[in-house]
A protein has these predicted regions:
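Pyridoxal 5′-phosphate
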Residues: 1-231
């Protein structure tokens, strides 16, 4: 009898044993609220701060630029909806091959007065130059192009694209969920080129589901998706 072979690691990965071992204490005896001032809470806060430093180091960012979320979809929605809420409606450009958690919230913004441009790709799945230039000519306020496509594996040079978008003043986001752990990510370097936000998720690289992050340039103003809990 044959056992199934798992070949869908682009969708999700099993939790690495080392990751599970690191998590177990916080699923058992360590249960403090990191906002609490007693020792249980302080221990949890120290663990979160350490995790924040580790994530920042993995993507070449400063720990203060790391915002934890419950998943890549939430992180992407945080940028699209959160940034749009702080701006007057205008042009929003996303590549035509973005993940649905970018495309769907972008389409929802049309009902709020935004204009959506879906940037075409060529026969190789790369950003079509003419379509990109047309979008930039419309002075977009928000742009999103993924670093690595989850279905085709096509890589987009987001730093180069962001640099061409600098004159528009748009906030540039890249979904780097599929790139994490497979390609070098240097947020500081990308940020100098004009990438303002990138999003990543743990479950693609042997981490748990429900753990992700948005890496944010501090100049980007976002409205929170969830109100309360600011303590």
């Amino acid at each position: 009898m044959f056992a199934p072979v798992y070949l869908d690691h682009n969708a999700t990965t099993p939790v690495d044993p080392a990751v599970l071992a690191a998590m177990l204490p916080w699923l058992q005896g360590q249960y403090g609220n990191p906002s609490s001032r007693h020792e249980y809470g302080r221990a949890a806060r120290r663990a979160i701060d350490e995790a924040r430093q580790q994530v920042a180091a993995a993507v070449g960012a400063h720990p203060t630029e790391v915002v934890f979320t419950s998943g890549g979809s939430e992180a992407n929605n945080l940028f699209i909806k959160g940034a749009a809420a702080c701006l007057k409606p205008g042009l929003l450009g996303v590549s035509a091959v973005e993940h649905p958690c970018i495309v769907k919230p972008a389409e929802q913004l049309v009902k709020q007065g935004w204009t959506l441009a879906k940037i075409a790709v060529d026969g190789n799945g790369c950003i079509d130059v003419a379509s990109w230039k047309k979008c930039l000519s419309g002075q977009p306020k928000l742009l999103s192009v993924m670093r690595a496509n989850n279905e085709t594996g096509v890589l987009h040079d987001v730093a180069a694209l962001a640099e061409t978008a600098l004159p528009t003043g748009a906030w540039f986001h890249t979904d780097a969920v599929q790139a994490l752990g497979k390609l070098p990510i240097d947020f500081r370097e990308w940020n100098r080129s004009g990438v303002h936000v990138l999003t990543i998720s743990a479950h693609k690289i042997g981490g748990p589901k429900g753990a992700a992050a948005a890496i944010l340039d501090k100049r980007v103003e976002l409205s929170p998706l969830i109100a309360g809990g600011g303590h």
